[in-house]
């Protein structure tokens, strides 16, 4: 699951760079939404991993 979170985070960062750079002005809101979803998924994965006793995050 952490692999998916990292993948979505990278996609969100790329979309954010393109959107905020003026290349694709309409994608700014989509990039923000995807970025925050990726952050939430990362935090959920980290909490679940810590709750299960895994030391890797």
From Swiss-Prot:
InterPro entries assigned: DUF1328
Lineage: superkingdom: Bacteria
Listed GO CC annotations: plasma membrane
Organism name: Rhodopseudomonas palustris (strain BisA53)
Localization per record: Cell membrane
Topological category with respect to the lipid bilayer: Multi-pass membrane protein
Official protein name in the record: UPF0391 membrane protein RPE_2138
Residues spanning the membrane: 4-24, 30-50
Broad class of the protein's primary localization: membrane
Record-stated family: Belongs to the UPF0391 family.
Record keywords: Cell membrane, Membrane, Transmembrane, Transmembrane helix
Keyword Disulfide bond applies: no
